[in-house]
Amino acid sequence: MSGVRAVSRLLRARRLALTWAQPAASPIGARSFHFTVDGNKRSSAKVSDAISTQYPVVDHEFDAVVVGAGGAGLRAAFGLSEAGFNTACVTKLFPTRSHTVAAQGGINAALGNMEEDNWRWHFYDTVKGSDWLGDQDAIHYMTEQAPASVVELENYGMPFSRTEDGKIYQRAFGGQSLKFGKGGQAHRCCCVADRTGHSLLHTLYGRSLRYDTSYFVEYFALDLLMENGECRGVIALCIEDGSIHRIRARNTVVATGGYGRTYFSCTSAHTSTGDGTAMVTRAGLPCQDLEFVQFHPTGIYGAGCLITEGCRGEGGILINSQGERFMERYAPVAKDLASRDVVSRSMTLEIREGRGCGPEKDHVYLQLHHLPPEQLAVRLPGISETAMIFAGVDVTKEPIPVLPTVHYNMGGIPTNYKGQVLRHVNGQDQVVPGLYACGEAACASVHGANRLGANSLLDLVVFGRACALSIAESCRPGDKVPSIKPNAGEESVMNLDKLRFANGTIRTSELRLSMQKSMQSHAAVFRVGSVLQEGCEKILRLYGDLQHLKTFDRGMVWNTDLVETLELQNLMLCALQTIYGAEARKESRGAHAREDFKERVDEYDYSKPIQGQQKKPFQEHWRKHTLSYVDVKTGKVSLEYRPVIDKTLNEADCATVPPAIRSY
């Protein structure tokens, strides 16, 4: 408890624990670089002028560094510290400001508190939800670990909603069933009313304060430090004073979240800018399946704010301008609780066919007022408040205007189920030494072409923990940290300096808006080849316009203009890979719906018996992962593909789910 009290005192004083070395330009009395949970611990920081004489550069050494302090980053960081590793956590936000806090609906686990359940049924639903693009070994691992992960959170103090007999309350969520799709709707989503992400993030942060982790708060990670194909840490900018920090570590975990802000209308925080995805791209490593962008069915019309799927899990329904519960036509069994890609497309079709609501007929309604007010007050208190603030709607009396809104990135940094980052060489997966990824920044791939609601929070805690366990299996605390070249990170500092003094003709905000509107119009719920091709050309042209940016703040203390410009560079790399991957994929699968290629293209035609069919060659079908690379100088995108993993971790314990026609 002494460590916790020490941190509490530090935070109240708004200062950080001293390091051995202050940067050369640090003003007297300024807040120091970072705090540790143990206020007596000191870092091995050393001032260096090897890469810049204009910017204060400080070198640090740790066993491991985690980039990002959302759910996945915190779980990885304190898992490593718990195992005895000297761990740093670099985050551009205070941990409890991370976007995990915005998750509403819940976290899936087959606890069986509402009816009989089995993790294998959860496994089946997740594979089906992925439209058979998910890797079944990773899905096996996640769903089997789910019950223990939720119990662990409960033991950490997460205040789950309860049933009358005191068990964790579980609500219905989309795409989830019992008995391998034959037993009706499952109630598998554990929740804290409609504020589950908020509770999870604060629970994990509170738990992390038990351990001696060094937090670099409000530090912007610029790039990975790569040498000889290995990751040896990160280079970061201290936003507060402009100093540069090279954090050398034997193991680096990327947990920076998604890149929803590539789109104009999204539920993501403004800080969801794909920083880790872009860092990996600049390191010459591939990203995977970025064309699969999830549109959440129920974003508030006009504002884009998330209205949780839990509303429909509690009994809410979608209606069109005729008052019709239209999902019965598109998903006769699951209805409003079909998977998100199915519901989003159905809503879009209703609007296209003239059954939209409002003066412009450009949205539909989510009706909740038929539910008891007591149920809304207990199970959906946050939604009631959000609807009133952003839509002016009293949910007990009138429906909420909603529209599909960008919500989640299924793609990301390719990893195996242990969290190890992969590259694809000569048709084989190879682990990138020293580099791990988890959370929305990663692509394990447990979500495939479409994520099931409430599997994202599960993904965070399962794979954040997996990264820590994997590192503990292969390394020991205190192992020698590999060296880096004296000028490591020099290009990152040169880029920073170039942006700081950029004197072109385009504002960062203007270019960002052009990119967001282009992505919104060219890579939306429904996609078509000609529009995607036009989008590729436009995004590539906008990428070139990065050379013509103008920044206005030349300072180094809290230069948010500079930080937003760095974020725009990251967003552009994500946007390029997303739209080029979408244009190349000539099929419809999960969240990627092509109007000119409406069918899923598998190795067999699974609408018919496969006996007697000839298997399509790998080059002729699309049940495969996209790997994308970008030439950072030109913006040219290169694509290749790797097979989906169909085998589970133990076929005797959990059999592979063979592809089938997906319906709800």
From Swiss-Prot:
Membrane topology label: Peripheral membrane protein
Localization: Mitochondrion inner membrane
GO CC list: mitochondrial inner membrane; nucleolus; respiratory chain complex II (succinate dehydrogenase)
Positions of post-translational Phosphotyrosine modification: 215
GO molecular function: electron transfer activity; flavin adenine dinucleotide binding; succinate dehydrogenase (quinone) activity
Keywords carried by this UniProt record: Acetylation, Electron transport, FAD, Flavoprotein, Membrane, Mitochondrion, Mitochondrion inner membrane, Oxidoreductase, Phosphoprotein, Transit peptide, Transport, Tricarboxylic acid cycle, Tumor suppressor
Family: Belongs to the FAD-dependent oxidoreductase 2 family. FRD/SDH subfamily.
Identification of the protein by name: Succinate dehydrogenase [ubiquinone] flavoprotein subunit, mitochondrial
Organism whose genome encodes this protein: Sus scrofa
